[in-house]
């Protein structure tokens, strides 16, 4: 048992990405008004609840992970199931408690999201596409949550595009993850697009959504985001998204594609964040 094991359990890289999403939502909504309390609180709440969600997901996935990912902290025996449960509960409680310091809307969304993540890990994940939709929704809410923490006039208009991008990119990533986990999911009767429709059809759906995302990706530049957005789009987001699309329609290809999609997601967060700066306009 080590700090490294706990960092792996909470998926610290994904948690940082979620927190950055909240910061981006706040800054875009506030038009880069640097209000430290709102920025830190929104990032902390989102990060803590996301971490709690990842931990509780691993708790319920322990049998599947013994097949798909035996190196993970719980199936490898580095962290016990009981300790993981306690950690998840603590993360959720602290995150919800901190949300009270923002506003009532932030509290409601934090509470609903935490309940949704528990429901997803326990039951909804096994229903397939509906589970994918919930994961995509909660991920996109990290950006929305940051904007809600500022809650100014026209905040919704400013963050709706990055929120939608996060939703669709996460949905695609969940479909690809289902392909990657096909063997373990099949043995444990977990319903995903891959186990329901097959690997090839699931790949096609993911690739169609990725192509559509690529087609509309320049849109934010033409409606107000600055030149930095376009540069990051061309240099990082588009290349790694294309790398995801051209992967072989296999389980191994899905594993590579999911890595590329993580890079696309992080680059997208940075692009929207820097692209909302009030200079370098095209």
Curated annotation (Swiss-Prot):
GO terms for biological process: glycerophospholipid biosynthetic process. The keyword Transcription does not apply. GO terms for molecular function: geranylgeranylglycerol-phosphate geranylgeranyltransferase activity; magnesium ion binding. It is found in: Cell membrane. Magnesium. Can also use Ca(2+), but less efficiently. It catalyses: sn-3-O-(geranylgeranyl)glycerol 1-phosphate + (2E,6E,10E)-geranylgeranyl diphosphate = 2,3-bis-O-(geranylgeranyl)-sn-glycerol 1-phosphate + diphosphate. It is a multi-pass membrane protein. Its EC number is 2.5.1.42. Optimum pH is 6.0. Gene3D superfamilies: UbiA prenyltransferase (1.20.120.1780). Its cofactor is Mg(2+); Ca(2+). It comes from the Archaea. Its main location: membrane. The keyword Oxidoreductase does not apply. InterPro entries: DGGGP_synth (IPR023547), Prenyltransferase_related (IPR050475), UbiA_prenyltransferase (IPR000537), UbiA_sf (IPR044878). This is Digeranylgeranylglyceryl phosphate synthase. It comes from Saccharolobus solfataricus (strain ATCC 35092 / DSM 1617 / JCM 11322 / P2) (Sulfolobus solfataricus). The lineage of its organism: Archaea, Thermoproteota, Thermoprotei, Sulfolobales, Sulfolobaceae. The gene is ubiA-2.
């Amino acid at each position: 048992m080590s700090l490294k094991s706990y960092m792996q359990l909470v998926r610290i890289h994904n948690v940082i990405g979620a927190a950055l999403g909240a910061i981006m939502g706040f800054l875009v909504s506030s038009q880069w008004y640097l209000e430290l309390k709102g920025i830190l609180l929104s990032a902390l709440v989102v990060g803590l609840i996301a971490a709690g969600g990842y931990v509780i997901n691993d708790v319920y996935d322990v049998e599947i992970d013994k097949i798909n990912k035996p190196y993970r902290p719980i199936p490898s025996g580095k962290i016990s199931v009981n300790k993981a449960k306690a950690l998840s509960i603590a993360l959720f409680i602290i995150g919800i408690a901190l949300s009270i310091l923002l506003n009532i809307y932030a509290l409601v969304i934090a509470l609903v999201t935490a309940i949704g993540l528990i429901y997803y890990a326990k039951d909804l994940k096994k229903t397939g596409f509906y589970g994918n939709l919930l994961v995509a929704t909660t991920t996109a809410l990290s950006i929305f949550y940051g904007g809600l923490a500022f809650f100014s006039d026209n905040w919704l208009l400013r963050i709706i595009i990055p929120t939608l991008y996060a939703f669709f990119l996460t949905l695609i990533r969940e479909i690809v993850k289902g392909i990657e986990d096909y063997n373990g999911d099949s043995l444990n009767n977990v319903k995903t697009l891959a186990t329901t429709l097959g690997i090839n059809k699931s790949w096609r759906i993911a690739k169609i959504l990725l192509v559509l995302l690529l087609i509309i990706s320049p849109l934010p530049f033409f409606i107000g985001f600055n030149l930095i957005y376009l540069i990051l789009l061309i240099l990082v987001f588009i290349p790694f998204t294309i790398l995801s699309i051209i992967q072989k329609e296999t389980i191994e290809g899905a594993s590579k594609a999911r890595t590329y999609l993580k890079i696309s997601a992080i680059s997208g967060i940075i692009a929207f964040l820097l692209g909302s700066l009030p200079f370098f306009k095209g």
